[in-house]
Amino acid sequence: MSFDRRCLKRVALPIAIKIVLAGERLAGITRDISPKGLCLEISTLRVKMNLLGILNTTVTLIFENEIMSGTVRWYTVEEATYQIGISIERQSKPTWKRIIDRHLRHDLSGLVKPA
């Protein structure tokens, strides 16, 4: 039996986002999103640091011309990618909401599914 602490529904939606980790800008793709956060996938080949040190630290997220702050809550390795769970900081939530709304509105394929 597993206990899921998520309080909001996740949506599987790939969005290209860059993250700044320890001063290094890395490209990633969201695995799933919610109004309060995201799961970002990054190739393990791109990450040159130990991620244990970034837990509960603030990171910068970059999407097109938008810059947001988030906190790393968890990470795991899945095949050749790191999955990093990030909660969006309060001051960045209006920006994150605009990004989510834009992507959900423009997804014409109808293939957006709950994560």
Where would I find each of the regions flagged by the language model?
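N-terminal helix initiation/capping motif
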Residues: 1-35, 42-43, 100-115
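Surface-exposed connector loops and short turns at secondary-structure junctions
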Residues: 44-55
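A short macromolecule-binding patch
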Residues: 50, 93-102
